[in-house]
Amino acid sequence: MSLPFHRLQRWNGQFYEVISLQDLGFTLNLGHNGDVCPLSTGDDKHSDQITVVDSAGIFVHSVRWCRCDGDEDKHLQLLRHRLFPSTISRPQTAFSFNVLDEFLIDSLECKTSASSFYSKLRRLTDNAFPDTLPVCFRILL
């Protein structure tokens, strides 16, 4: 999938409701150009759930790692897909390169703090209930 960080809405008969790609069963496959790793069984055993912060908002995705011999560490697989992991050992949060570039420009030109920038992303994701989203701005620093 080429656009994993788009916000979706689905008509439920009365109104459009927000729905995630994860709700639709989407899993972000790392390695093999987005295809499932041949050594993966396709079950949840080889996947993790991570929070991805993008300039379009905050998303939770299932991620299936490449398991081939000589496969890269998880943090390197994320970097190859232009996602900067929050930690090297067990990444549970990642920031897209786009959001990092946007934060850099906002902080240099507008003097935006990490807290304010992250609050903006929370509002973009859910303007009605931004406090229901995870707080990751300290990781952004």
Give the predicted meaning of each segment.
Residues 1-141:
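Hydrophobic core positions in small helical hairpin nucleic-acid-binding modules
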